Amino acid sequence: MKVRIKRLSENAIMPKRAHATDAGFDLYCTETSVDWAKQELLCHTGIAFEIPEGHAGLIFPRSSIANKPLLLHNSVGVIDSNYRGEVTAKFIITDAREFLQNDGGYHSGDRICQMIILPYPEIEFEEAEELSVTDRGKGGYGSTGR
C-alpha cells in the first residue's frame, strides 16, 4: 500500500521501520514546545499523511518511553483517512524535575512514537432486545482473574 506524505518542515524525517518485520514505523520529532501550566510536551513531526480510505493511522508510544517521565496524552492517537494536517504527539510530563534533569524529553531528530496503519471494517449497528449468552456474561474489570 502506498501512503502519500507531505513534508511540512525542512527538517522533517520520513517515517521508518527499525526492522523490516516491524508492524509500526517510527515518527520523528522536528520541534517541541512545553506548556508548563498543563505539564504537557508537544512534539511536531513536520509531516502530514494521506491515509487511504478504509484505513486509520494509530499512534502508539514507543517502548523506550518507559525510560522518560512522559505518557502519550491520549494513550493511542487515531489519525483518520480524511485528516490532512500535521501529525503531532502530545505527552503528559509526569515528573517535571526528572524531565528537566533529562534535558527535556525529546529533541529534533528523535523518534517519538510509532504509527501503525490498519484497515477497518464497515460496521452497521443493530439495536437488539437481547444479546447472546456467553460464559463471561456481564463480568467486567478483573472478572477473569489475575
What are these regions (language model features)?
Residues 1-146:
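DUTPase catalytic domain/fold
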